């Protein structure tokens, strides 16, 4: 099998497009509806939480200037410098995201010790787990904060906020099965309207108080901490809400490319957000009574209802982007061996990567609705929001450090100062958010702990199971010698034996041969492996070895953004001379019955968890799209 390329050079066509070409412009337009939904709707609650939240600061002119200075420099240093300038350079063949970053640090290359790579893999797993917590909170807080605009219009609408939010969220999750390809085409134009609108609203107030622009001076931020000390640090946990969703610039890079995302961020999203934030600051300088909801305070009263509608649509787009991101993350986790098999439905024939996972969708729906019903106000959820994002950003910085030192070969003299700069901001925000643990932050940490424990247990359990199976395998040369010596009867057709490892003879074949004493004319040993690249071209997917006597070994390589498909594999194999008749082909699968009494080093409760996850995992037949009427399952009892 060909060795996979670990270089940091992208094979993605979008990345190399010129910054100001028509293609880049169109991709930048499309990215507005996917990448910026979360960070683009942060003005709905970010400034409000600083002056009217659980950990609010006194509303006075020095504090307004200090908070706006922190907002400006947070967005500049974390989003513009860290992500746009540096992290987005670490693409894996055009793809971004925390698993793509992990794949750039291959453990089998000699660049990093196995023990250290295990620590790095744990960090990536923890980062991914935190994103699941984010995926639960984002739809709830975004839609709830938008619908709360009705309270500004009339106090009579207050009892309707929670029911309307639940209706919107319920509809959002129920339409996921239909895919987002069609409605996704209008997301970009809607977000253009959103950004232009919030920019205009903010600019209108800045004209009244242009002195608010002086807040770009970092001196105001230092004076803010000097004056407020501990309370100022706590408020930093609310300021960080202005950069939540910033990690999507990197995570969604594979869909649009580096230059289109940079263009859309610097050309529209970033300026529009700054204008709105500074406009809210100008409003509070003029009328402190709007501290309870400064975003809607910018809106003329006659336009409140249309603005609530636009805000709700924008938050639905933000929620959709997060839900799609969780689906994609789950697909990657399954392929990389961190998650049990689940039913993955591809919702678009034209666009790779648009997937729907029913189990994940309904778990998210139940969790989101539960949060809305329990907390009832977006301010209550704000405490749970920032801790996941800041922890994930810190873990991204650490993984990026390993990429630039182990893969790109940067010297420590260059890499360490950059890491220190990134972690200074990341850990400052994370530390400030620790004060929110009892105000809702525990929700995110609990979700992350459950997901991370499950992922690591599944990874370790599958490794222990693979070792157990391999230890009982017969070398292929001994098996083939036995077949040649006994010359068993051969029946017409093809038998395909799925194999965990591309070495030795699968236990399912040994059992079949032992009990039936017969073989098919053509026997294929099929192994599916995951690579450290997002996708594998069809021409490189298969590695075929003729073992003789009608036996063939096929090793199919799939990227971590792809879902293996047996019919596709057999079609590609036929193009290389391995011809099979679907009506005369049988698929033999080993079905393990797992016990916890084995000698593996896993703790007993983790063994029990792994056995439970295995029993509830999706079947290979459904996951690999194997024709169910051609499947033969052979039972095998294994103690781990």
Curated annotation (Swiss-Prot):
Keywords: Cell inner membrane, Cell membrane, Ion transport, Membrane, Potassium, Potassium transport, Symport, Transmembrane, Transmembrane helix, Transport. Its main location: membrane. It catalyses: K(+)(in) + H(+)(in) = K(+)(out) + H(+)(out). GO terms for molecular function: potassium ion transmembrane transporter activity; symporter activity. Pfam families: K_trans, K_trans_C. The keyword Cell inner membrane applies. Transport of potassium into the cell. Likely operates as a K(+):H(+) symporter. The chain crosses the membrane at residues 19-39, 67-87, 118-138, 155-175, 181-201, 230-250, 265-285, 307-327, 355-375, 384-404, 415-435, 437-457. Belongs to the HAK/KUP transporter (TC 2.A.72) family. It is found in: Cell inner membrane. The gene is kup2. The lineage of its organism: Bacteria, Pseudomonadati, Thermodesulfobacteriota, Syntrophobacteria, Syntrophobacterales. It comes from Syntrophobacter fumaroxidans (strain DSM 10017 / MPOB). This is Probable potassium transport system protein Kup 2. One of its GO terms (cellular component) is plasma membrane. It is a multi-pass membrane protein. It comes from the Bacteria. The keyword Protein transport does not apply.
């Amino acid at each position: 099998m060909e060795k996979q390329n670990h270089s940091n050079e992208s094979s993605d066509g979008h990345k190399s497009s010129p910054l100001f070409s028509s293609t880049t412009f169109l991709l930048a337009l499309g990215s507005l509806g996917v990448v910026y939904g979360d960070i683009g709707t942060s003005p709905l609650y970010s400034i409000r939480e600083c002056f009217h939240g659980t950990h609010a600061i006194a509303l006075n002119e020095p504090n307004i200037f200090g908070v706006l200075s922190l907002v400006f420099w947070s967005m500049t240093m974390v989003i513009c410098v860290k992500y746009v300038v540096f992290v987005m350079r670490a693409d894996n063949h055009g793809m971004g995201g925390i698993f793509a970053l992990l794949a750039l640090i291959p453990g089998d290359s000699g660049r990093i010790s196995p023990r250290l790579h295990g620590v790095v893999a744990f960090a990536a797993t923890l980062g991914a787990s935190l994103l699941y917590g984010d995926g639960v909170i984002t739809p709830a807080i975004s839609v709830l904060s938008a619908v709360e605009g009705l309270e500004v219009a009339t106090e009579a609408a207050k009892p309707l906020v929670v029911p309307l939010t639940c209706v919107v969220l319920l509809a959002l999750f129920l339409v996921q099965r239909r895919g987002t390809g069609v409605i996704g085409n209008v997301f970009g134009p809607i977000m253009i309207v959103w950004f232009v609108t919030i920019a205009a609203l903010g600019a209108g107030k800045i004209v009244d108080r242009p002195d608010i622009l002086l807040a770009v001076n970092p001196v105001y931020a230092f004076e803010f901490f000097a004056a407020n000390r501990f309370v100022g640090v706590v408020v930093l946990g609310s300021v960080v809400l202005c950069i939540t969703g910033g990690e999507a610039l990197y995570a969604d890079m594979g869909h649009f490319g580096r230059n289109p995302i940079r263009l859309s961020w610097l050309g529209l999203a970033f300026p529009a957000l700054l204008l709105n934030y500074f406009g809210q600051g100008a409003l509070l300088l003029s009328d402190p009574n709007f501290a309870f909801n400064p975003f809607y305070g910018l809106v003329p009263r006659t336009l409140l209802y249309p603005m609530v509608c636009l805000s709700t649509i924008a938050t639905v787009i933000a929620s959709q982007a997060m839900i799609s991101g969780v689906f994609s993350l789950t697909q990657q986790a399954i392929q990389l061996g961190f998650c049990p098999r689940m039913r993955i439905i591809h919702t678009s024939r034209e666009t790779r990567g648009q997937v729907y996972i029913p189990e994940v969708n309904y778990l998210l729906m139940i969790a989101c609705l539960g949060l809305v019903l329990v907390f009832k106000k977006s301010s209550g959820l704000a405490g749970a929001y920032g801790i996941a994002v800041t922890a994930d950003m810190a873990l991204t910085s650490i993984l990026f450090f390993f990429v630039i030192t182990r893969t790109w070969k940067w010297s420590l003299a260059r890499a360490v100062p950059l890491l220190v700069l990134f972690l200074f901001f990341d850990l400052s925000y994370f530390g400030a958010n620790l004060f929110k643990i009892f105000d809702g932050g525990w929700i995110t940490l609990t979700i992350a702990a459950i997901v991370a424990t499950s992922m690591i247990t599944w990874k370790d359990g599958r490794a222990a199971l693979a070792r157990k199976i391999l230890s009982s395998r017969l070398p292929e040369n001994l098996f083939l010698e036995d077949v040649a010596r006994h010359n068993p009867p051969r029946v017409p057709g093809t038998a395909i034996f799925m194999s965990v490892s591309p070495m030795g003879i699968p236990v399912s074949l040994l059992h079949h041969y032992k009990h039936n004493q017969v073989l098919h004319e053509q026997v294929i040993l099929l192994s599916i492996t995951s690579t450290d690249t997002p996708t594998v071209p069809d021409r490189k997917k298969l590695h075929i070895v003729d073992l003789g006597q009608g036996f063939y070994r096929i090793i199919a390589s799939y990227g971590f953004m792809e879902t293996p498909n047996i019919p596709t594999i057999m079609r590609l194999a036929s193009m290389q001379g391995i011809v099979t008749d679907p009506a005369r082909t049988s698929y033999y699968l080993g079905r393990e019955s797992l016990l916890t009494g084995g000698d593996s080093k896993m703790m007993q409760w983790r063994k029990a968890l792994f056995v439970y996850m295995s029993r509830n995992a999706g079947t290979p037949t459904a996951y690999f799209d194997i024709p169910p009427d051609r499947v033969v399952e052979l039972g095998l009892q294994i103690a781990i």
